[in-house]
Structures are given as structure tokens and as C-alpha cells.
């Protein structure tokens, strides 16, 4: 019984991971985006490397937006970028956003120690909604939390995190008015 529960959890995590890969493919814009996803699949053992040795992938940066109030907002395009954004970019008092209970990009709102207006929170949440599996819906529920509250379990696949929050909002998936750099 216990082994079955453990196996069920592993299968659920595997499905969630593969859904995150599908989402990353769907929001890919360039060949470099797809190359990053392929490299991740090689590193996680889903596909075999066709050329011997470690293949160097061109550095591919997260998407960068600026809110109406002048705050920088970054959006990961794949699981590796999501990990980079969440654990190596910004500081603990920046805000982290993610579509609730569905695959999607990690979104980081850099505060630089300033008070963040509601409109900027809404724009960051809209980016998390749009760059998620829910992008075809008009509205998506988005969780947000201080970056320092987001943790990566030991041995977790790229892009997988845990967080506990009482903060969520329903966000519009329309991002046409948010300036991308």
C-alpha cells in the first residue's frame, strides 16, 4: 500500500514535469529556446545525446518586461530558466509569481527595495497567467509570494519548486499593454 502511494506520487510528479516541458515548447519563440529544452531533456535522461561530449548551448535569457510603473519583470521560458530566475536572480524580497496548480513560467518581479503598486502586481500576475497552460483562458488564478519563500526539494527536476502562500489573485491573460524589452 505504502509503495503504491509512493509510486503514484512519482508518476504524478513525472506527468507534471512533462506538462511543464510541453508548456515551455508552446511558449518558445526561437531555436535557442527549443535547444535549451532539448538540453534539459538530455540532462534529465529523457532523450540521448546524439554527439559525444557535452554540447554547449547558447546562453538564452529569460524574457524581460517593464511594468507601467517602471519595475523590471522577468519570465522564464523553460524549466532551467525558471530555476535560474527563482534561485539565482534578484533577492529574497523580490516577488515570485506562478499560475496556480498548472504548468507555467516562473515570473520574478524585482522590487529594488521599493513599494510595489497594485497595477504592477497585476501585470506580473498577467504574465504568469499568459505564460502558463491556462493562456487560452480569459482569467487564471496566480499565486505570488516573496522569492525567499520558494524552495527546491532535494533531487527535484528542473523547474519544480514548493511554496506556501495565502496570496493569490485572478489575473487576466491579456499582456498586450506590458512593455517587453
Each predicted region: which residue ranges?
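Hydrophobic alpha-helix feature that most strongly marks membrane-spanning transmembrane helices
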Residues: 16, 23, 112, 126-136
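Domain-scale macromolecular recognition modules
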Residues: 46-124
Amino acid at each position: 500500500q505504502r509503495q503504491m502511494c509512493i509510486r503514484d506520487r512519482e508518476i504524478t510528479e513525472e506527468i507534471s514535469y512533462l506538462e511543464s516541458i510541453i508548456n515551455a515548447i508552446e511558449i518558445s519563440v526561437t531555436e535557442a529556446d527549443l535547444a535549451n529544452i532539448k538540453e534539459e531533456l538530455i540532462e534529465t535522461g529523457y532523450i540521448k545525446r546524439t554527439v559525444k561530449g557535452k554540447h554547449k548551448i547558447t546562453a538564452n535569457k529569460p524574457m524581460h518586461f517593464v511594468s507601467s510603473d517602471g519595475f523590471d519583470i522577468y519570465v522564464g521560458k523553460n524549466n532551467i530558466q525558471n530555476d535560474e530566475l527563482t534561485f539565482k536572480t534578484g533577492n529574497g524580497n523580490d516577488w515570485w509569481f506562478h499560475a496556480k496548480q498548472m504548468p507555467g513560467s516562473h515570473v520574478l518581479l524585482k522590487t529594488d527595495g521599493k513599494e510595489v503598486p497594485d497595477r504592477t502586481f497585476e501585470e506580473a500576475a498577467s504574465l504568469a497567467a499568459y505564460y502558463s497552460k491556462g493562456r487560452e483562458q480569459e482569467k487564471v488564478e496566480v499565486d505570488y509570494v516573496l522569492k525567499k519563500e520558494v524552495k527546491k526539494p532535494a533531487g527535484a527536476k528542473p523547474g519544480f519548486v514548493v511554496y506556501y502562500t495565502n496570496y493569490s489573485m485572478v489575473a487576466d491573460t491579456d499582456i498586450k499593454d506590458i512593455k517587453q524589452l
